[in-house]
Amino acid sequence: GQQKERQQVVDELNKKQKQLTASLNKQRKIYAHLNARIDKLIQEEIAAAERRRKAEAERRRKAELARQRKLRQQREQAAARRKQTASSSKNKSSRKGKNNYDAEETATPDFTASHDVDRALSGSFAANRGRLPMPITGSYAITTHFGQYNVPGLRGVQLDNKGINITGRPGAQARSVFRGEVTAIFAYSGMYNIIVRHGSYMTVYCNLASTSVRRGQEVSARQVLGSVAKDASGNCTLHFQLRKETTKLNPESWLAR
């Protein structure tokens, strides 16, 4: 009788192990696809930023050439006017020509270059390392840390977390950790996911039930992005990632506690 009971316990444990493994494999597959989508969108954003940088450099080059050309023409015109009127009003023409020349020489193209804005934003984001607000409203607990971790209940099985999981209270909302631009909003596995660009830094907010921003929108620090959905266990859990271009960073060293 005892042997039969022991066998039943073993069978039950094996059954639970198989269920846990199946659930884990499903979760692993979902996260692999999600991260592949995030990687692709971030690569596209990096490529777009590089195109903008090159286009701005070309615009500046052309504007500088045009400025120099105009300045050269004005110098030539001023010299011609001085020569023409030298006999009648030499001093007056010289002053006028010099004034025109000086005014044009100090005039430079007026640019609001997004590349310069990106660089400034990247610098200010980096300067706030360790001081960024938590990306979730209300009280919270970090339930899964960055990097590899052992799966509870499965001996020797590890998963690799590209960010951190933050569990909050029911009704918790995701919020931007810094000012930036919403560059992507996409749905995956029934949940919304948002990418916000802060210069060369990107923050990713996953597992949202709804969103309250749109693509291309400028957001401020602590601005609500959407409501956090419940995970498989019924908890409101936000998956949060931080990247510097393609490099994955540990968010915990950047967030204030």
Question: Residue spans of the language-model regions?
Answer:
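Zn2+-dependent peptidoglycan hydrolase active-site motif and core
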Residues: 176-210
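Alpha-helical oligomerization segments with coiled-coil/rod-like character
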Residues: 1-91
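Short glycine/threonine/proline-enriched tight-turn/helix- or strand-capping micro-motif at secondary-structure
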Residues: 112-131, 143-176, 199, 244
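Generic structural motif
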Residues: 134-144, 172-182, 222
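Short aromatic-glycine-enriched beta-strand elements
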Residues: 152-162, 189-195, 236-238
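Residue-level recognition of beta-strand microenvironments
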Residues: 145, 185-186, 228-231
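Conserved, short, structured surface segments that act as functional micro-motifs
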Residues: 194-197, 215-257
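Long, low-complexity, acidic/serine-threonine-proline-glutamine-glycine-rich intrinsically disordered tracts
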Residues: 69-139, 144
